């Protein structure tokens, strides 16, 4: 639950209503939020869990980006998907062992992932490249977007989905931007700036590893945030607001 004026704040109530209607009122729906909503949901985000979650988002973004740049051109059908499965299993073991989520460990792992995908035999031929931008649920959920990625790939297109980490940084940035626009506690602005600097360091390492392996790598978030200036206010944040404009310009 984002706590904003978007649908994400209300999904949980719709899910509970649907479960009751389907005859499963005993099934709980836990909320992940940083807005003080659903305090008794039974799910609490701790710092160690947050660090692992951020690492998973970085790894997931990289795997998706590399998979989508290899799959349309692979000589052996399914090779890219098998590589994704291999790394998901490998990273899962590492994270469960309490490793792999520090900045140093991620920066060490990124080039290894990129190298493995670059080793997949491909035949590069011209294809239509389609970028997908949208509200967070519709962009990533096959159910929400009518399985858009599968359809585009069936039309022999290369699909580009901007990563989830961009949305995470967007949410953090907005907390600091609210201080600039409306005032509030300076500590919030300072805290968000420090967190964004840490995320930027890891993100740039991921993008460098991607580019060094011969793949397309978008600009980091700190460059992305500059793109919509003069087109839309950075205070426009409902429905992913200025982020959608920035991603369209980037693509």
Q: Where do the protein language model's features map onto the residues?
A:
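An N-terminal assembly and electron-transfer interface module characteristic of large anaerobic redox
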Residues: 1-251
């Amino acid at each position: 639950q984002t706590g904003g004026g978007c649908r994400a704040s209300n999904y949980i109530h719709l899910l509970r209503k649907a479960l009751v209607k389907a005859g499963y009122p005993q099934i709980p729906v836990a909320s992940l939020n940083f807005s003080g909503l659903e305090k008794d949901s039974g799910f609490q985000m701790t710092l160690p869990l947050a660090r692992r979650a951020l690492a998973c988002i970085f790894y997931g973004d990289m795997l998706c980006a590399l998979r989508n740049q290899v799959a349309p051109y692979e000589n052996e059908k399914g090779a890219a998907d098998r590589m994704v499965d291999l790394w998901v299993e490998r990273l899962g073991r590492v994270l469960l062992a309490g490793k792999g989520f520090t900045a140093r460990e991620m920066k060490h792992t990124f080039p290894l992932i990129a190298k493995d995908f670059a080793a997949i035999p491909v035949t590069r031929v011209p294809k239509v490249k389609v970028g997908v931008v949208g509200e967070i649920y519709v962009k990533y959920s096959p159910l929400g977007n009518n399985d858009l990625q599968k359809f585009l790939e069936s039309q022999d297109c290369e699909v580009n989905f901007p990563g989830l980490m961009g949305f995470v940084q967007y949410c953090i940035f907005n907390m600091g931007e609210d201080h600039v626009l409306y005032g509030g506690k300076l500590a919030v602005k300072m805290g968000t700036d420090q967190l964004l600097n840490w995320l930027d360091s890891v993100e740039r390492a991921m993008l460098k590893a991607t580019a060094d392996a011969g793949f397309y790598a978008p600009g980091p978030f700190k460059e992305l945030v500059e793109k919509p200036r003069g087109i839309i206010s950075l205070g426009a944040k409902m429905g992913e607001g200025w982020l959608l404009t920035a991603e369209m310009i980037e693509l």
